[in-house]
A protein has these predicted regions:
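Conserved beta-strand signature within the Rossmann-like core of class I S-adenosyl-L-methionine
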Residues: 140-147
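Acceptor-substrate binding/catalytic loop of class I
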Residues: 157-173
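A short glycine-rich, Lys/Arg-flanked "PGG" loop and its adjoining helix->strand segment in the class I
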Residues: 127-139
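Core SAM-dependent methyltransferase catalytic element
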Residues: 194-213
Length: 213
């Protein structure tokens, strides 16, 4: 079953630039991209899935000389991203619609980033989403992803004046799900994170760097 996430997109449209204000410290995300950059060839094609405002990831990748495509379901976030990172390409797409070939096909990428995007899916959809991301990578390509560590499945949480439905895994379960989707985990990090806004709960963030096997 594919869940309609229109309401999630509308929430992020309304949140807009307040997202970066509420989450100003993104050391874990920046470090995961640094690990990815060490594995990429020059002028690599890199896809940022759930790119949000384009910061910091699309900017970090573009500044390193790579060809960056960002996709997001929120038109409002994409408008900000185009301003923040004018050298990247931004597309209004749902993760589930991404494909290599055919109408709207994106081709394959040397690297994919997917930070806190999978947590917006019910658990039953996450393994399929990971396999889809794998299909978008060249053989031996690299994925950097993050999730919030939590034993949740499509649970409603308050977030910057809105209610979002989110899922999460405990660490060992996340490793298992990622490995079963066809990835070798090559790096891992975690951060305890307290948002600047009191309208977003504290969280424990997990970052994985992976290679398509």
């Amino acid at each position: 079953m594919v869940v309609d996430r229109t309401g999630q997109a509308e929430a992020f449209d309304a949140i807009g630039k307040r997202y970066d204000e509420a989450f100003p410290h993104k050391e874990g995300q920046i470090a995961a991209v640094q690990r990815l950059l060490a594995e990429l060839p020059a002028q690599a094609r890199v896809l940022d899935v759930g790119c949000g405002t384009g910061l910091p990831t699309c900017g970090q990748l573009a500044d390193a000389g790579h060809r960056v495509t960002g996709v997001d379901l929120s038109a409002g976030m994409l408008e900000l991203a185009r301003t923040h990172v004018p050298g990247a390409e931004f597309l209004h797409r749902d993760l589930a619609s991404l494909r290599v070939e055919g109408p709207g096909g994106l081709g394959r990428f040397d690297g994919v980033t997917c930070f806190f995007t999978l947590l917006m899916l019910p658990r039953e959809e996450i393994p399929h989403a990971l396999r889809l991301l794998r299909s978008l990578l060249v053989p031996g390509g690299h994925l950097a992803l993050s999730m919030v560590e939590a034993d949740l499945d499509d649970a409603g949480i308050p977030f910057l004046g809105h209610t979002l439905r989110v899922s999460g895994y405990l660490r060992e379960e996340l490793r298992r799900v990622v490995s079963e989707a066809g990835f070798e985990i090559t790096g891992e990090d975690d951060y305890a994170y307290a948002p600047a806004s009191t309208d977003a709960p504290p969280e424990y963030q997990l970052f994985l760097n992976c290679r398509r096997d």
